[in-house]
């Protein structure tokens, strides 16, 4: 997994959905700082958040882990 690629993907999908980091964080019950760290590739979302994040971004968990839409990584 490439943290930077995943972060860019999260950023792209969040912006496509018209959400701020604060709004996405509020929906996931995390801080905007946590979302910022994911997007900058400094950390990854906790495994317990992946499904909720995927729902908010309207993608599959595997697409988040690949950092690309339409790509499926075997989990």
Region locations from a protein language model:
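Short alpha-helical DNA-recognition segment
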Residues: 18-37, 52
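Short, charged recognition helix plus adjacent turn
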Residues: 65-75
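Short, conserved catalytic or interaction motifs in soluble domains
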Residues: 40
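A short, Lys/Arg-rich alpha-helix, primarily the initiator
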Residues: 1-16
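Short coil turns linking two alpha-helices in DNA-binding domains
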Residues: 2, 20, 31-34, 46, ...
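DNA major-groove recognition helix of helix-turn-helix/homeodomain DNA-binding modules
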Residues: 48-63
